[in-house]
Amino acid sequence: VTGVQTCALPILSALKDIDEIYLHHVLHSLSIAAIANFKPKTEIIDIGCGGGFPGVPLAIFFPDVKFHLVDSIGKKLKVVEAIAEGAGIKNITTQHTRVEEIKNRKFDFAISRAVAPLKELWRWSKPILKKDNNNEMVNGLICLKGGDLHQEIFESGTRPKMMSVYEIFNEDYFKEKFILYVKRS
């Protein structure tokens, strides 16, 4: 057992089988591609990337887009790095830090999946988003969330566009899953 495998075991142990990984993680991540057609050289930060979702599937789908995956837990990043290296994914970089600590870089978009309340995600994202847009969508935060989001959205003070993942992928798992998009103002 290698060091990377040792790191990966606790992260992947909750995933029951390949179908679950594909449906619950890969497809869910790729739902972002249904609403955003990122142009080449777009720079995206994945906040709290965990085991690499949504960043890794999106990096495969958009090979000319630069993805910077950030997490405060180093073990998770080791798994992401091993996956990227093993799959030959060249458009991913990683950083072991909290997003609030990033001061010297700007991105076109921030993405996340099940990381923190929208209010926090927006507070962390807004300072690191570029002002100039290179895509059809205005630069901003795109996050994947589930459940009843009305209170969370209200408390965030933002006015996100909210799209149902179920309308993209007609699977029961996605009935209460949503994509939230907050434009940089």
Protein language model features and the residues they cover:
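Active-site capping/gating segments
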Residues: D148-S185
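A short, conserved alpha-helix within the catalytic core of class I
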Residues: L118-P127
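Conserved beta-strand segments of alpha/beta enzyme cores
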Residues: K66, N91-T93, G140, K161-S164
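Short, small-residue-biased leader/transition segments that mark boundaries at the very start
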Residues: T2-L9
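Conserved beta-strand signature within the Rossmann-like core of class I S-adenosyl-L-methionine
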Residues: N133-D148
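Conserved SAM-binding loop and adjacent beta-strand
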Residues: A14-A33
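Conserved SAM/SAH cofactor-binding pocket of Class I
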Residues: L30-S112, W122
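A generic alpha-to-beta junction signature in SAM-dependent methyltransferases
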Residues: A36, L129-N135
